[in-house]
Curated annotation (Swiss-Prot):
Any one annotated GO CC term: cytosol
Family to which this protein belongs: Belongs to the glutamate--cysteine ligase type 1 family. Type 1 subfamily.
Protein name, as recorded: Glutamate--cysteine ligase
EC number: 6.3.2.2
NCBIfam families noted in UniProt: glu_cys_ligase
Gene coding for it: gshA
Alphabetical keyword list: ATP-binding, Glutathione biosynthesis, Ligase, Nucleotide-binding
Database matches in InterPro entries: Gln_synth/guanido_kin_cat_dom, Glu_cys_ligase, Glut_cys_ligase
Pathway: Sulfur metabolism; glutathione biosynthesis; glutathione from L-cysteine and L-glutamate: step 1/2
Organism of origin: Pseudomonas fluorescens (strain ATCC BAA-477 / NRRL B-23932 / Pf-5)
GO biological process, one term: glutathione biosynthetic process
Amino acid sequence: MKESNLSELLNRRLALLGERANLSLLEQCLHGIERECLRVTGEGRLAQTPHPEELGSALTNEQITTDYSESLLEFITPALKDPADTLASLDKIHRFAYSKLGNEYLWSPSMPCPLPAEEDIPIAYYGTSNIGQLKYVYRKGLALRYGKTMQCIAGIHYNFSLPEQLWPLLKQAEGFVGTDRDYQSSAYIALIRNFRRYSWLLMYLFGASPALDAGFLRGRSHQLEQLDAETLYLPYATSLRMSDLGYQSKAQAGLTPCYNDLNSYTDSLRKAVATPYAPYVEVGTHKDGEWVQLNTNILQIENEYYSNIRPKRVTYTGERPIQALMARGIQYVEVRCLDINPFLPLGIDIQEARFLDAFLLYCALNDSPLFENNECGNATSNFLAVVKEGRRPGLQLQRQGQPVEMKEWAAQLLEQIAPLAALLDQSHGSDVHSKALDAQLAKVKDSSLTPSAQVLAAMSEHKESFTQFSLRQSQAHAEYFRSQTLSKEEQAAFEEAARKSLEQQTELEQNEVGDFDVFVGAYQASILAISN
């Protein structure tokens, strides 16, 4: 590969990290995965049962919780150095969950099963403590603002951090004037800018939602095509989940946090959680004496902002995400645009994780100029073009104001990511990252190898609707997890964690002091009180 293709900055950083004294640093990256999935009946319909008590408390269990709906499970791994260990942890959580699910299944793809009427989709319930009620009212607000149907879409979140010792090393080499914390935050914001530039590539390579159940759109007008009586699709789509049919929010339309620095990012979110939005004001926070939303602002809380990647910092009890970021800077990023691959029991595999590491390292170490002119808008339109028609032959994207063929740009990007994969391999003493990259290059050369193409091919081969295909995959994965149970010790550890979480919730509820209305007021004030 010609080194001249890489930026001077990237070459310098590659050389520095390739030095013997620094090489082991890259083994210290941390990886965490969150996987959402709907609980469904044997007929592939939404399970209307409460969150199984044997899985513990959705409020306090660190590994098994619920997302939007009582029927939408979320599995959370610890952050580990080797993504193979992260996936092994996710696998064990699935096996434990299946030991308690009775005759229910975990729905394998991102797009939901046929859903009941909006009012019959149960909102996740977290008990009577103030924090539990806050989570519940927040979800009521989401239903009011966006409808419940959209909230039933599931995804994979990939949490990734570079080693803390890496930043002072780069900072010193580059003569950055300022604190280590400021350098680290600006480097993560630079990663996010590059992610915005290049994340369309992930949608082509890993998008796996080209079709959905026809009832999902609830009769709204759309540009999708009919595949069969029960299925809508787009022939060249990679990820309808990430297209504009997924989340449409007029309120959030004007909210495009600028990723120029951490301050401007937290600033725009702070304004959004403190700025009233007329249609929400009209509804108010209460109806018939009951809370219906936490407030009438553009965002109820900062996590309501919908984005493909988020800067993150672990929060202390009672602390808000913005407070943590402003106080202690960025600690890791959360990649939120990955579809669940319905052919994989976990929805993601080690090859995808190894490639993501190389891709994110490329985003972190490559030049990342500030967005200028219409570059931010182009990043959004490139992303939307690929999710809707990424496999269309000859598809063109915009690069620095010029049209470029997507496949040509994809191949060039993979060529530039190759030295990062090689560096990771050198650090780990293996060739797994380079092999993962080769597998992605094969998809660029042949679009039939992409998961989105394979979903449509499988449905066509078996003459199945989206729901029939998805149920078949869900049943196959259930068999996979149930065929190999956890060891007695592992099962006992999960059961103990579930039991402890229920005790914690009870304790929270019994020791609760103070009125919920006052609690919400204090929660609101905590944002307004932050001064730059």
